[in-house]
Structures are given as C-alpha cells and as structure tokens.
C-alpha cells in the first residue's frame, strides 16, 4: 500500500485536520485562550435540542460529555485511520483498492461507533472548563478575572474564576449594555445567560477585592 496514493486522499486530509487543530490549540494556549472552550461557547443551541433524532445523535457522539473540539478531532482521526486501514486490507485481499464511494460510508459508520465507545472511556479523564466541585449556578456571586481581549454586551470574552477549592474555571463573561470589559479587569458574576455565558459587572469593591 502506498500511503500517499490518491485513494487515501480523504483519509489523509482528515488526519491533517487533526494535526492542524492540535497546532491551533497550542497557539491559542500560548496566547492565553482555549480553542475548545471557544467552540463550545458557540454551540449554545445544543441546549435547546431536547428531543428527536438530532438530540440522540449528539448524545451518542458524547457531545456534552466531551468538549466539542475533542469529539470533532476523534471523528476526523478515526475516519482517517479506519479509511486507510480498510484500503490497506482491500489491497492485501484483492490486490487493488476499492472505490471511496464504498469505503467512505463504511469508514464513517465505524468511525461513529468508535467515537461513541472511545468517548465513554476517555470522558472521565478529559479536563473540562467546569468541575464537579461546585455547580455552574454557584459561579454567581463569585469574582472572576477577564483573560480575553475585550467584551461588550452580546460579545463575551473569556474569564477565569478560582473557586473555594482552588480549582480554576474558564467562563464566557459579558457586561451589561453600554459597559466594556478589558483584559485584567476584575468582575463580579451576577447571573447566568446560557449554558456557557454569564453576565457580570465591574468589581463593586475595588478597594477590598
């Protein structure tokens, strides 16, 4: 089997995508951000999906148990690996690769199954932006530090909260209408807007906290 043959193109592309995401995540961490957290923040509409086949599919893929970016990388990685292995098996048996019109759907099917079971195994070991030490509702009334560049009403940025157990949580915070948060601001979380977004105000006790 020739790894870089044309019949392996879609699978090599998928593996390259995983490597690219890894590089982008490293770059984002160097800049003080979390690419996975940013993606999850833009998936608030998942919270409104409570019934139907879409909800079942998302649950099967462990969306919610794992960060969305991790699920995406698992999908791409397994698809690339399974596709290459299937084509290799075909060459070993029939001395010729099969058409990707057949191999791609089969690879997708095995990929979905692999992601489901792998996700269930690794989910307890994946660090999330929240912890079981306190619930998300308990963030309200806590002080946080703005770590993103800038936030305005409707356009949140990342903030860092350290709970009473010393654990760090990264949240998306935004100010009230007409206010602006900038990097380094200390803010008070006052209410929850969605699964990942919170409303905050500037530190009302700057002389104390």
Swiss-Prot record:
It is a multi-pass membrane protein. Keywords: Cell inner membrane, Cell membrane, Membrane, Transmembrane, Transmembrane helix. Residues 1-11, 87-101 are periplasmic. Residues 33-65, 123-209 are cytoplasmic. GO terms for cellular component: plasma membrane. The keyword Cell inner membrane applies. One of its GO terms (biological process) is DNA damage response. The chain crosses the membrane at residues 12-32, 66-86, 102-122. The keyword Cell inner membrane applies. Its main location: membrane. It is found in: Cell inner membrane. This is Inner membrane protein YqiJ. The lineage of its organism: Bacteria, Pseudomonadati, Pseudomonadota, Gammaproteobacteria, Enterobacterales. The gene is yqiJ.
